Amino acid sequence: MTNDFFKMVLAGLLVAPAFTACSDSDDAKNLGELEAEEQAFGKATGNFTAEEWFPGGKLGTTEKASYSAPTPAVQNIAGMEEDFNTGEDFFEHLYTFEQAPRRGLGPAWVRNGCIHCHPSYGHGKRQTEYRANTVGNGYLLVIYHPSNNAYISEVTGMPQTQAMAPFKAPIDENQIQIEWKNVTAMESGLSMTFPDGEAYSLIYPEVRIPQSAFNTNPKPTDYDVRLESTIGVYGTALLDAIDDADIEAQWAAEAKHATLNPAMWDSEANTFKASAYYSAPYNDTGKHNGSRGPLKRFTYAMTRGSLQDGAGANAIWNITNVTRSDRHWLYTTTAWAKAQSEDPEVISYIKQHGSSPTSILYPYYADGTEEGIAKRVYEVLNTPSVAYKETFEKYLLNGAPYNGVEEMTDKQYYQFMVWHRGLAVPAARNLNDADVQRGKALFSEIGCANCHRPSWTTGSDNMWVDASTKAYAKQIGKNASDMLPKYANQTIWPYTDLVQHRLFMANDIRTGWCRTTPLWGRGLSRRLTGADDRLHDCRARTVVEAIMWHGYSKQSDAYRPTEKFYNLPKSDRDAIVKFIESI
Protein backbone atom coordinates (compact mmCIF):
# COMPACT_ATOMS: atom_id res chain seq x y z
CA MET A 1 0.00 0.00 0.00
CA THR A 2 1.36 3.38 -0.96
CA ASN A 3 1.25 6.59 1.04
CA ASP A 4 -1.15 8.07 -1.53
CA PHE A 5 -4.18 6.32 -0.05
CA PHE A 6 -3.77 7.86 3.36
CA LYS A 7 -2.93 11.28 2.01
CA MET A 8 -6.11 11.19 -0.01
CA VAL A 9 -8.26 10.09 2.93
CA LEU A 10 -7.11 13.13 4.89
CA ALA A 11 -7.43 15.41 1.89
CA GLY A 12 -10.95 14.15 1.26
CA LEU A 13 -12.01 15.71 4.54
CA LEU A 14 -10.81 19.11 3.41
CA VAL A 15 -11.51 19.46 -0.29
CA ALA A 16 -14.83 20.53 -1.78
CA PRO A 17 -17.07 17.66 -2.97
CA ALA A 18 -16.69 16.71 -6.61
CA PHE A 19 -19.67 16.37 -8.88
CA THR A 20 -17.95 14.44 -11.62
CA ALA A 21 -15.48 11.67 -11.18
CA CYS A 22 -12.98 10.81 -13.91
CA SER A 23 -10.69 8.08 -12.67
CA ASP A 24 -7.39 9.81 -11.92
CA SER A 25 -8.31 13.48 -12.05
CA ASP A 26 -9.49 13.66 -8.44
CA ASP A 27 -6.25 12.62 -6.73
CA ALA A 28 -5.94 14.49 -3.45
CA LYS A 29 -3.05 16.76 -2.61
CA ASN A 30 -0.19 15.63 -0.41
CA LEU A 31 -1.07 16.89 3.06
CA GLY A 32 1.53 14.98 5.03
CA GLU A 33 2.32 11.61 6.51
CA LEU A 34 -0.14 9.47 8.45
CA GLU A 35 2.24 6.92 9.88
CA ALA A 36 -0.21 5.18 12.21
CA GLU A 37 -2.67 4.37 9.43
CA GLU A 38 0.14 3.44 7.06
CA GLN A 39 1.48 0.93 9.51
CA ALA A 40 -1.95 -0.53 10.25
CA PHE A 41 -3.30 -0.79 6.71
CA GLY A 42 -3.68 -4.30 5.38
CA LYS A 43 -2.91 -5.89 8.74
CA ALA A 44 -5.13 -7.45 11.36
CA THR A 45 -5.96 -4.86 13.99
CA GLY A 46 -8.19 -5.23 17.02
CA ASN A 47 -11.30 -7.17 15.94
CA PHE A 48 -10.68 -6.57 12.22
CA THR A 49 -8.94 -9.10 10.02
CA ALA A 50 -6.38 -8.01 7.45
CA GLU A 51 -8.91 -8.82 4.69
CA GLU A 52 -11.42 -6.26 5.97
CA TRP A 53 -9.30 -3.37 4.71
CA PHE A 54 -10.23 -4.66 1.23
CA PRO A 55 -14.07 -4.69 1.05
CA GLY A 56 -14.00 -5.69 -2.62
CA GLY A 57 -11.32 -8.33 -2.15
CA LYS A 58 -7.87 -8.03 -3.64
CA LEU A 59 -9.31 -7.86 -7.19
CA GLY A 60 -12.13 -5.41 -6.45
CA THR A 61 -10.74 -2.78 -4.05
CA THR A 62 -9.10 0.54 -4.86
CA GLU A 63 -6.65 2.39 -2.63
CA LYS A 64 -8.31 5.66 -3.66
CA ALA A 65 -11.02 7.41 -1.69
CA SER A 66 -13.15 7.32 -4.83
CA TYR A 67 -16.23 5.65 -6.29
CA SER A 68 -14.92 5.93 -9.85
CA ALA A 69 -11.60 4.07 -9.81
CA PRO A 70 -10.98 0.86 -11.81
CA THR A 71 -10.46 -2.43 -10.04
CA PRO A 72 -7.14 -4.28 -10.06
CA ALA A 73 -8.96 -6.87 -12.20
CA VAL A 74 -9.19 -4.19 -14.91
CA GLN A 75 -5.70 -2.84 -14.40
CA ASN A 76 -4.12 -6.29 -14.52
CA ILE A 77 -5.25 -7.00 -18.11
CA ALA A 78 -3.47 -5.22 -20.95
CA GLY A 79 -5.74 -2.83 -22.82
CA MET A 80 -8.74 -3.21 -20.53
CA GLU A 81 -8.20 0.07 -18.69
CA GLU A 82 -8.43 1.91 -22.02
CA ASP A 83 -11.83 0.29 -22.63
CA PHE A 84 -12.78 1.15 -19.03
CA ASN A 85 -11.98 4.82 -19.63
CA THR A 86 -13.97 4.89 -22.86
CA GLY A 87 -16.91 3.21 -21.13
CA GLU A 88 -16.66 5.80 -18.38
CA ASP A 89 -17.18 8.51 -20.98
CA PHE A 90 -20.59 7.05 -21.84
CA PHE A 91 -21.55 7.35 -18.18
CA GLU A 92 -20.17 10.81 -17.49
CA HIS A 93 -21.34 12.82 -20.50
CA LEU A 94 -24.73 13.77 -21.87
CA TYR A 95 -26.52 12.16 -24.80
CA THR A 96 -27.77 14.10 -27.81
CA PHE A 97 -30.11 13.43 -30.72
CA GLU A 98 -27.49 13.08 -33.46
CA GLN A 99 -23.96 13.87 -32.24
CA ALA A 100 -21.66 10.82 -32.10
CA PRO A 101 -20.52 9.00 -30.06
CA ARG A 102 -23.39 9.66 -27.62
CA ARG A 103 -26.32 9.94 -30.01
CA GLY A 104 -29.84 8.54 -30.14
CA LEU A 105 -31.51 10.37 -27.26
CA GLY A 106 -35.29 10.04 -27.25
CA PRO A 107 -37.92 10.40 -28.54
CA ALA A 108 -38.79 10.42 -24.80
CA TRP A 109 -36.37 9.91 -21.95
CA VAL A 110 -35.94 9.81 -18.18
CA ARG A 111 -32.53 11.56 -18.14
CA ASN A 112 -30.14 12.61 -20.90
CA GLY A 113 -27.19 11.11 -19.05
CA CYS A 114 -26.22 8.78 -16.22
CA ILE A 115 -24.23 11.18 -14.06
CA HIS A 116 -27.37 13.18 -13.19
CA CYS A 117 -28.66 10.27 -11.12
CA HIS A 118 -25.34 9.04 -9.73
CA PRO A 119 -23.40 12.10 -8.50
CA SER A 120 -19.73 11.11 -8.32
CA TYR A 121 -21.01 7.56 -9.02
CA GLY A 122 -22.72 7.45 -5.62
CA HIS A 123 -26.21 7.54 -4.11
CA GLY A 124 -28.71 10.11 -5.36
CA LYS A 125 -29.46 13.21 -3.29
CA ARG A 126 -32.69 14.23 -1.58
CA GLN A 127 -34.73 16.67 -3.67
CA THR A 128 -37.51 19.10 -2.86
CA GLU A 129 -38.72 19.25 -6.46
CA TYR A 130 -38.52 16.86 -9.39
CA ARG A 131 -36.37 18.17 -12.22
CA ALA A 132 -34.84 15.65 -14.60
CA ASN A 133 -31.88 17.87 -15.43
CA THR A 134 -30.78 18.54 -11.84
CA VAL A 135 -27.41 16.92 -11.19
CA GLY A 136 -27.78 14.69 -8.15
CA ASN A 137 -31.48 14.00 -8.65
CA GLY A 138 -31.33 10.23 -8.54
CA TYR A 139 -35.07 9.84 -8.13
CA LEU A 140 -37.14 7.57 -10.30
CA LEU A 141 -40.87 8.06 -10.07
CA VAL A 142 -42.74 4.95 -8.98
CA ILE A 143 -46.36 5.17 -10.12
CA TYR A 144 -48.52 2.18 -9.27
CA HIS A 145 -51.98 0.92 -8.39
CA PRO A 146 -52.18 0.57 -4.58
CA SER A 147 -54.74 -2.22 -4.84
CA ASN A 148 -52.18 -4.68 -6.23
CA ASN A 149 -48.87 -2.74 -6.29
CA ALA A 150 -48.68 -3.12 -10.09
CA TYR A 151 -47.09 -0.33 -12.11
CA ILE A 152 -49.51 1.71 -14.17
CA SER A 153 -49.35 0.88 -17.87
CA GLU A 154 -49.92 4.35 -19.32
CA VAL A 155 -46.28 5.40 -18.80
CA THR A 156 -43.07 3.41 -18.68
CA GLY A 157 -41.97 1.66 -15.49
CA MET A 158 -39.33 4.34 -15.06
CA PRO A 159 -41.51 7.29 -16.04
CA GLN A 160 -40.26 9.81 -18.60
CA THR A 161 -40.62 13.56 -18.12
CA GLN A 162 -38.63 14.68 -21.18
CA ALA A 163 -39.27 14.44 -24.93
CA MET A 164 -37.95 15.90 -28.18
CA ALA A 165 -40.04 18.43 -30.06
CA PRO A 166 -42.79 18.25 -31.07
CA PHE A 167 -43.71 15.37 -28.78
CA LYS A 168 -45.11 16.08 -25.31
CA ALA A 169 -43.34 14.29 -22.47
CA PRO A 170 -45.40 11.42 -21.02
CA ILE A 171 -45.45 13.36 -17.72
CA ASP A 172 -45.24 17.12 -17.31
CA GLU A 173 -42.69 17.38 -14.50
CA ASN A 174 -43.76 20.96 -13.71
CA GLN A 175 -46.91 19.51 -12.15
CA ILE A 176 -45.07 17.05 -9.87
CA GLN A 177 -45.16 18.06 -6.21
CA ILE A 178 -42.82 16.73 -3.51
CA GLU A 179 -43.66 17.63 0.08
CA TRP A 180 -41.44 16.57 2.97
CA LYS A 181 -43.39 15.63 6.10
CA ASN A 182 -42.07 15.53 9.65
CA VAL A 183 -42.63 12.45 11.79
CA THR A 184 -44.24 13.69 14.99
CA ALA A 185 -44.39 10.29 16.70
CA MET A 186 -42.97 6.85 16.04
CA GLU A 187 -45.67 4.25 15.38
CA SER A 188 -43.63 1.83 17.49
CA GLY A 189 -43.84 4.06 20.54
CA LEU A 190 -40.13 4.86 20.65
CA SER A 191 -39.60 8.46 21.70
CA MET A 192 -38.12 11.01 19.30
CA THR A 193 -35.56 11.65 22.02
CA PHE A 194 -32.98 9.09 23.11
CA PRO A 195 -32.98 8.17 26.82
CA ASP A 196 -29.88 10.32 27.35
CA GLY A 197 -31.74 13.40 26.08
CA GLU A 198 -30.39 13.68 22.53
CA ALA A 199 -33.19 14.34 20.03
CA TYR A 200 -33.47 13.08 16.46
CA SER A 201 -35.93 13.88 13.70
CA LEU A 202 -37.33 11.91 10.78
CA ILE A 203 -38.87 13.09 7.52
CA TYR A 204 -40.53 11.36 4.58
CA PRO A 205 -41.81 12.47 1.16
CA GLU A 206 -45.34 12.72 -0.13
CA VAL A 207 -45.49 12.94 -3.92
CA ARG A 208 -48.46 14.06 -5.97
CA ILE A 209 -48.87 13.95 -9.73
CA PRO A 210 -52.27 15.22 -10.91
CA GLN A 211 -53.96 13.40 -13.75
CA SER A 212 -53.56 16.53 -15.88
CA ALA A 213 -49.78 15.98 -15.89
CA PHE A 214 -50.09 12.83 -18.02
CA ASN A 215 -49.85 13.26 -21.79
CA THR A 216 -51.30 9.82 -22.48
CA ASN A 217 -54.52 8.32 -23.79
CA PRO A 218 -56.00 7.03 -21.63
CA LYS A 219 -54.80 8.86 -18.56
CA PRO A 220 -54.15 6.70 -15.49
CA THR A 221 -56.61 6.38 -12.62
CA ASP A 222 -56.37 5.04 -9.06
CA TYR A 223 -52.64 5.45 -8.59
CA ASP A 224 -50.12 6.33 -5.90
CA VAL A 225 -46.63 7.75 -6.31
CA ARG A 226 -43.40 6.94 -4.51
CA LEU A 227 -39.77 7.88 -5.04
CA GLU A 228 -36.84 5.51 -5.42
CA SER A 229 -33.29 6.83 -5.53
CA THR A 230 -30.27 5.42 -7.27
CA ILE A 231 -27.52 3.82 -5.21
CA GLY A 232 -23.80 3.72 -5.89
CA VAL A 233 -22.75 1.69 -8.93
CA TYR A 234 -19.32 0.64 -7.64
CA GLY A 235 -18.76 -2.99 -6.63
CA THR A 236 -21.87 -4.39 -8.31
CA ALA A 237 -19.86 -6.92 -10.33
CA LEU A 238 -18.68 -8.45 -7.06
CA LEU A 239 -22.27 -9.10 -6.02
CA ASP A 240 -22.84 -10.60 -9.47
CA ALA A 241 -20.04 -13.07 -8.74
CA ILE A 242 -21.68 -14.58 -5.63
CA ASP A 243 -22.98 -18.09 -6.34
CA ASP A 244 -26.74 -18.56 -6.43
CA ALA A 245 -26.42 -21.49 -4.00
CA ASP A 246 -24.77 -19.31 -1.37
CA ILE A 247 -27.54 -16.72 -1.61
CA GLU A 248 -30.15 -19.47 -1.36
CA ALA A 249 -28.46 -20.77 1.80
CA GLN A 250 -28.70 -17.28 3.31
CA TRP A 251 -32.42 -17.05 2.53
CA ALA A 252 -33.00 -20.53 3.96
CA ALA A 253 -31.20 -19.61 7.17
CA GLU A 254 -33.30 -16.48 7.61
CA ALA A 255 -36.53 -18.31 6.72
CA LYS A 256 -36.19 -20.21 10.01
CA HIS A 257 -37.02 -17.09 12.01
CA ALA A 258 -38.47 -14.55 9.57
CA THR A 259 -41.18 -14.20 6.95
CA LEU A 260 -39.63 -13.81 3.51
CA ASN A 261 -41.11 -12.31 0.37
CA PRO A 262 -43.60 -14.90 -0.98
CA ALA A 263 -43.00 -13.61 -4.50
CA MET A 264 -39.45 -14.96 -4.18
CA TRP A 265 -39.48 -17.67 -1.53
CA ASP A 266 -41.52 -20.89 -1.26
CA SER A 267 -41.89 -21.27 2.51
CA GLU A 268 -43.30 -24.80 2.27
CA ALA A 269 -40.55 -26.16 0.01
CA ASN A 270 -37.96 -23.96 1.75
CA THR A 271 -36.44 -22.89 -1.53
CA PHE A 272 -36.73 -20.20 -4.16
CA LYS A 273 -39.74 -20.05 -6.43
CA ALA A 274 -39.20 -20.14 -10.19
CA SER A 275 -39.97 -16.40 -10.22
CA ALA A 276 -36.80 -15.72 -8.20
CA TYR A 277 -34.66 -16.60 -11.22
CA TYR A 278 -34.20 -13.99 -13.89
CA SER A 279 -35.27 -14.39 -17.50
CA ALA A 280 -36.22 -12.00 -20.29
CA PRO A 281 -38.21 -12.50 -23.51
CA TYR A 282 -35.53 -10.74 -25.57
CA ASN A 283 -32.44 -12.79 -24.62
CA ASP A 284 -31.25 -16.18 -23.36
CA THR A 285 -30.60 -15.32 -19.70
CA GLY A 286 -33.31 -17.79 -18.71
CA LYS A 287 -31.13 -20.66 -19.96
CA HIS A 288 -27.84 -19.54 -18.42
CA ASN A 289 -27.93 -22.33 -15.84
CA GLY A 290 -29.66 -24.89 -18.02
CA SER A 291 -33.35 -24.61 -17.25
CA ARG A 292 -33.19 -21.33 -15.36
CA GLY A 293 -31.51 -17.97 -15.33
CA PRO A 294 -29.35 -16.31 -12.67
CA LEU A 295 -30.87 -15.61 -9.28
CA LYS A 296 -32.32 -12.12 -8.89
CA ARG A 297 -30.19 -9.89 -6.67
CA PHE A 298 -30.18 -6.34 -8.09
CA THR A 299 -32.48 -3.34 -7.40
CA TYR A 300 -34.57 -2.71 -4.29
CA ALA A 301 -37.28 -4.95 -5.72
CA MET A 302 -34.77 -7.63 -6.79
CA THR A 303 -35.90 -7.55 -10.40
CA ARG A 304 -32.56 -8.29 -12.09
CA GLY A 305 -30.28 -11.30 -11.91
CA SER A 306 -27.28 -10.55 -14.12
CA LEU A 307 -25.27 -7.35 -14.26
CA GLN A 308 -25.08 -7.74 -18.05
CA ASP A 309 -28.88 -7.38 -18.11
CA GLY A 310 -29.09 -5.52 -14.82
CA ALA A 311 -30.09 -2.03 -13.82
CA GLY A 312 -27.08 -0.35 -15.46
CA ALA A 313 -27.17 -2.40 -18.66
CA ASN A 314 -30.81 -1.50 -19.05
CA ALA A 315 -30.44 2.09 -17.90
CA ILE A 316 -28.05 2.98 -20.71
CA TRP A 317 -30.99 2.03 -22.94
CA ASN A 318 -34.20 2.88 -21.10
CA ILE A 319 -33.09 6.00 -19.23
CA THR A 320 -31.94 7.66 -22.46
CA ASN A 321 -33.86 5.57 -25.04
CA VAL A 322 -30.55 4.99 -26.82
CA THR A 323 -30.87 1.69 -28.68
CA ARG A 324 -28.30 -0.95 -29.62
CA SER A 325 -28.20 -4.22 -31.55
CA ASP A 326 -29.96 -6.23 -28.83
CA ARG A 327 -32.50 -3.47 -28.07
CA HIS A 328 -34.28 -2.73 -31.34
CA TRP A 329 -37.37 -1.23 -29.76
CA LEU A 330 -38.25 1.89 -27.80
CA TYR A 331 -38.85 2.41 -24.12
CA THR A 332 -42.39 3.61 -24.64
CA THR A 333 -46.07 2.82 -24.11
CA THR A 334 -49.10 2.45 -26.32
CA ALA A 335 -50.97 5.11 -24.33
CA TRP A 336 -48.26 7.70 -25.03
CA ALA A 337 -48.06 6.76 -28.72
CA LYS A 338 -51.82 7.16 -29.04
CA ALA A 339 -51.85 10.57 -27.35
CA GLN A 340 -49.06 11.89 -29.57
CA SER A 341 -50.72 10.58 -32.73
CA GLU A 342 -53.90 12.45 -31.77
CA ASP A 343 -52.21 15.76 -30.90
CA PRO A 344 -52.81 18.40 -33.64
CA GLU A 345 -49.70 20.36 -32.60
CA VAL A 346 -47.52 17.27 -33.01
CA ILE A 347 -48.96 16.47 -36.43
CA SER A 348 -48.68 20.06 -37.66
CA TYR A 349 -45.06 20.40 -36.58
CA ILE A 350 -44.01 17.17 -38.28
CA LYS A 351 -45.87 18.23 -41.42
CA GLN A 352 -43.88 21.47 -41.49
CA HIS A 353 -40.45 20.17 -40.47
CA GLY A 354 -40.25 16.45 -41.22
CA SER A 355 -40.14 16.16 -45.00
CA SER A 356 -36.35 16.06 -45.41
CA PRO A 357 -34.70 12.61 -45.26
CA THR A 358 -31.99 14.19 -43.09
CA SER A 359 -34.48 15.24 -40.39
CA ILE A 360 -34.89 13.13 -37.26
CA LEU A 361 -38.63 13.66 -37.76
CA TYR A 362 -38.56 12.01 -41.20
CA PRO A 363 -39.50 8.54 -39.86
CA TYR A 364 -42.82 10.06 -38.73
CA TYR A 365 -43.54 12.03 -41.94
CA ALA A 366 -45.05 9.20 -44.01
CA ASP A 367 -46.87 10.71 -47.03
CA GLY A 368 -46.99 14.19 -45.53
CA THR A 369 -50.74 14.22 -44.98
CA GLU A 370 -52.16 14.77 -41.52
CA GLU A 371 -53.81 11.36 -41.62
CA GLY A 372 -50.63 9.67 -42.82
CA ILE A 373 -48.47 11.40 -40.22
CA ALA A 374 -50.86 10.52 -37.39
CA LYS A 375 -50.89 6.88 -38.42
CA ARG A 376 -47.08 6.77 -38.72
CA VAL A 377 -46.52 8.52 -35.36
CA TYR A 378 -48.59 5.86 -33.66
CA GLU A 379 -46.87 3.05 -35.56
CA VAL A 380 -43.33 4.23 -34.75
CA LEU A 381 -43.88 5.30 -31.14
CA ASN A 382 -45.85 2.16 -30.35
CA THR A 383 -42.81 -0.15 -30.43
CA PRO A 384 -42.54 -1.04 -26.72
CA SER A 385 -41.09 -4.56 -26.90
CA VAL A 386 -39.10 -7.03 -28.96
CA ALA A 387 -42.36 -7.99 -30.69
CA TYR A 388 -42.13 -4.66 -32.55
CA LYS A 389 -38.51 -5.14 -33.63
CA GLU A 390 -39.39 -5.27 -37.33
CA THR A 391 -41.24 -1.96 -37.23
CA PHE A 392 -38.45 -0.32 -35.26
CA GLU A 393 -35.79 -1.51 -37.68
CA LYS A 394 -37.81 -0.36 -40.68
CA TYR A 395 -38.21 3.22 -39.52
CA LEU A 396 -35.66 3.93 -36.76
CA LEU A 397 -32.66 1.94 -37.99
CA ASN A 398 -32.64 1.07 -41.68
CA GLY A 399 -34.65 4.03 -42.93
CA ALA A 400 -33.56 7.66 -43.30
CA PRO A 401 -31.94 9.47 -41.58
CA TYR A 402 -30.33 6.52 -39.72
CA ASN A 403 -29.54 4.39 -42.76
CA GLY A 404 -28.48 1.33 -40.79
CA VAL A 405 -26.23 3.06 -38.23
CA GLU A 406 -26.74 1.87 -34.64
CA GLU A 407 -27.15 4.52 -31.96
CA MET A 408 -24.78 2.58 -29.69
CA THR A 409 -22.40 0.10 -31.31
CA ASP A 410 -21.57 -3.33 -29.93
CA LYS A 411 -18.04 -2.16 -29.15
CA GLN A 412 -19.32 0.89 -27.29
CA TYR A 413 -21.69 -1.22 -25.22
CA TYR A 414 -18.89 -3.66 -24.44
CA GLN A 415 -16.72 -0.76 -23.26
CA PHE A 416 -19.58 0.50 -21.12
CA MET A 417 -19.86 -2.92 -19.48
CA VAL A 418 -16.09 -3.10 -18.88
CA TRP A 419 -16.50 0.16 -17.00
CA HIS A 420 -19.64 -1.02 -15.17
CA ARG A 421 -18.09 -4.31 -14.09
CA GLY A 422 -14.77 -2.62 -13.42
CA LEU A 423 -15.73 -0.08 -10.74
CA ALA A 424 -13.83 -0.73 -7.53
CA VAL A 425 -14.99 -0.50 -3.93
CA PRO A 426 -12.95 2.04 -1.93
CA ALA A 427 -10.73 0.56 0.77
CA ALA A 428 -11.95 0.67 4.36
CA ARG A 429 -10.69 3.43 6.60
CA ASN A 430 -9.83 3.90 10.29
CA LEU A 431 -10.09 0.23 11.19
CA ASN A 432 -7.27 0.72 13.71
CA ASP A 433 -9.41 3.27 15.59
CA ALA A 434 -10.63 2.02 18.98
CA ASP A 435 -14.10 3.56 18.54
CA VAL A 436 -14.50 1.94 15.11
CA GLN A 437 -13.53 -1.42 16.60
CA ARG A 438 -16.05 -0.96 19.42
CA GLY A 439 -18.66 0.07 16.86
CA LYS A 440 -18.07 -3.14 14.93
CA ALA A 441 -18.61 -5.23 18.05
CA LEU A 442 -21.79 -3.36 18.96
CA PHE A 443 -23.09 -3.58 15.38
CA SER A 444 -23.06 -7.37 15.72
CA GLU A 445 -24.14 -7.51 19.36
CA ILE A 446 -27.38 -5.60 18.84
CA GLY A 447 -28.25 -7.59 15.70
CA CYS A 448 -27.51 -5.26 12.77
CA ALA A 449 -25.27 -7.90 11.19
CA ASN A 450 -28.23 -10.31 10.98
CA CYS A 451 -29.37 -8.48 7.83
CA HIS A 452 -26.26 -6.49 6.99
CA ARG A 453 -24.24 -9.68 6.63
CA PRO A 454 -20.61 -8.58 6.69
CA SER A 455 -18.87 -10.96 4.31
CA TRP A 456 -19.30 -13.25 1.32
CA THR A 457 -16.93 -15.28 -0.82
CA THR A 458 -17.50 -15.06 -4.55
CA GLY A 459 -17.73 -18.16 -6.73
CA SER A 460 -16.20 -18.92 -10.12
CA ASP A 461 -17.92 -15.85 -11.64
CA ASN A 462 -19.35 -17.81 -14.54
CA MET A 463 -21.31 -14.81 -15.77
CA TRP A 464 -24.00 -14.65 -18.43
CA VAL A 465 -22.80 -12.63 -21.44
CA ASP A 466 -25.11 -10.44 -23.50
CA ALA A 467 -25.61 -10.57 -27.27
CA SER A 468 -23.92 -7.22 -27.93
CA THR A 469 -20.71 -8.27 -26.21
CA LYS A 470 -20.81 -11.61 -28.02
CA ALA A 471 -21.25 -9.83 -31.35
CA TYR A 472 -18.27 -7.59 -30.68
CA ALA A 473 -16.19 -10.56 -29.53
CA LYS A 474 -16.98 -12.32 -32.79
CA GLN A 475 -15.90 -9.24 -34.75
CA ILE A 476 -12.46 -9.25 -33.13
CA GLY A 477 -12.05 -13.02 -32.87
CA LYS A 478 -12.14 -13.35 -29.08
CA ASN A 479 -14.07 -15.40 -26.52
CA ALA A 480 -16.77 -13.16 -25.05
CA SER A 481 -16.66 -14.83 -21.64
CA ASP A 482 -13.02 -13.77 -21.23
CA MET A 483 -13.49 -10.13 -22.21
CA LEU A 484 -15.14 -8.70 -19.09
CA PRO A 485 -13.61 -8.21 -15.61
CA LYS A 486 -14.04 -11.23 -13.33
CA TYR A 487 -13.87 -11.62 -9.56
CA ALA A 488 -13.61 -15.31 -8.77
CA ASN A 489 -12.93 -16.55 -5.23
CA GLN A 490 -12.76 -13.14 -3.57
CA THR A 491 -13.58 -12.53 0.09
CA ILE A 492 -15.70 -9.39 0.05
CA TRP A 493 -17.33 -7.24 2.74
CA PRO A 494 -20.49 -5.59 1.34
CA TYR A 495 -22.61 -5.76 4.54
CA THR A 496 -25.77 -7.08 2.92
CA ASP A 497 -27.57 -10.41 3.14
CA LEU A 498 -29.08 -9.93 -0.34
CA VAL A 499 -32.48 -10.66 1.19
CA GLN A 500 -35.60 -8.51 1.04
CA HIS A 501 -37.04 -7.24 4.31
CA ARG A 502 -39.90 -5.04 5.47
CA LEU A 503 -39.52 -1.98 7.71
CA PHE A 504 -43.16 -0.76 7.65
CA MET A 505 -42.19 2.89 7.32
CA ALA A 506 -44.58 5.78 6.70
CA ASN A 507 -45.15 6.09 2.94
CA ASP A 508 -43.14 2.94 2.47
CA ILE A 509 -41.54 1.56 -0.68
CA ARG A 510 -44.03 0.26 -3.27
CA THR A 511 -44.45 -3.36 -2.12
CA GLY A 512 -43.02 -2.96 1.36
CA TRP A 513 -40.23 -5.40 0.46
CA CYS A 514 -36.76 -3.95 0.00
CA ARG A 515 -33.36 -5.58 -0.54
CA THR A 516 -30.79 -4.88 2.16
CA THR A 517 -28.58 -2.20 0.64
CA PRO A 518 -24.80 -2.78 0.83
CA LEU A 519 -23.02 -0.45 3.27
CA TRP A 520 -19.54 -0.65 1.77
CA GLY A 521 -18.05 2.70 0.85
CA ARG A 522 -21.06 4.73 1.99
CA GLY A 523 -19.01 6.59 4.59
CA LEU A 524 -17.30 8.50 1.78
CA SER A 525 -20.55 9.86 0.38
CA ARG A 526 -20.46 13.30 1.97
CA ARG A 527 -16.87 13.86 0.87
CA LEU A 528 -17.42 12.66 -2.68
CA THR A 529 -20.98 13.78 -3.44
CA GLY A 530 -21.71 16.50 -0.88
CA ALA A 531 -24.57 14.58 0.72
CA ASP A 532 -25.13 11.56 2.94
CA ASP A 533 -28.77 10.80 2.15
CA ARG A 534 -29.77 7.19 2.72
CA LEU A 535 -32.61 4.70 2.29
CA HIS A 536 -34.63 4.11 -0.85
CA ASP A 537 -36.04 7.64 -1.16
CA CYS A 538 -33.27 9.62 0.59
CA ARG A 539 -35.52 10.21 3.60
CA ALA A 540 -32.61 9.59 5.99
CA ARG A 541 -30.22 12.54 6.09
CA THR A 542 -27.79 10.85 8.48
CA VAL A 543 -26.77 7.37 9.58
CA VAL A 544 -28.72 7.81 12.83
CA GLU A 545 -31.90 8.70 10.94
CA ALA A 546 -31.45 5.66 8.70
CA ILE A 547 -31.13 3.42 11.75
CA MET A 548 -34.13 4.90 13.54
CA TRP A 549 -36.36 4.44 10.48
CA HIS A 550 -35.74 0.72 11.01
CA GLY A 551 -37.66 1.08 14.29
CA TYR A 552 -40.56 3.21 13.10
CA SER A 553 -42.91 0.23 13.49
CA LYS A 554 -42.83 -2.75 15.83
CA GLN A 555 -43.68 -4.85 12.78
CA SER A 556 -40.32 -3.96 11.24
CA ASP A 557 -37.95 -6.86 10.63
CA ALA A 558 -35.28 -4.71 12.28
CA TYR A 559 -37.25 -3.32 15.22
CA ARG A 560 -35.37 -5.21 17.97
CA PRO A 561 -31.87 -4.14 16.86
CA THR A 562 -33.15 -0.57 16.50
CA GLU A 563 -34.64 -0.64 19.98
CA LYS A 564 -31.27 -1.78 21.33
CA PHE A 565 -29.51 0.99 19.44
CA TYR A 566 -32.01 3.49 20.85
CA ASN A 567 -31.18 2.42 24.41
CA LEU A 568 -27.41 2.60 24.01
CA PRO A 569 -25.51 5.53 25.53
CA LYS A 570 -24.48 8.23 23.07
CA SER A 571 -20.84 7.11 23.03
CA ASP A 572 -21.91 3.65 21.84
CA ARG A 573 -24.32 5.04 19.24
CA ASP A 574 -21.53 7.26 17.95
CA ALA A 575 -19.19 4.27 17.77
CA ILE A 576 -21.65 2.35 15.59
CA VAL A 577 -22.02 5.35 13.29
CA LYS A 578 -18.25 5.73 13.07
CA PHE A 579 -17.93 2.05 12.19
CA ILE A 580 -20.57 2.29 9.44
CA GLU A 581 -18.78 5.31 8.00
CA SER A 582 -15.44 3.47 7.96
CA ILE A 583 -16.24 0.19 6.20
Positions of PLM-derived features:
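Intrinsically disordered, low-complexity terminal tails
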Residues: 1, 24-26
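Bacterial N-terminal signal peptides that target proteins for export
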Residues: 1-9
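C-terminal motif of bacterial Sec signal peptides marking the signal peptidase cleavage site
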Residues: 19-21
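Electron-transfer interface patches adjacent to heme c in soluble/periplasmic c-type cytochromes
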Residues: 26-85, 94-417, 421-434, 442-583
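N-terminal cofactor/phosphate-binding cores enriched in small/glycine residues
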Residues: 88
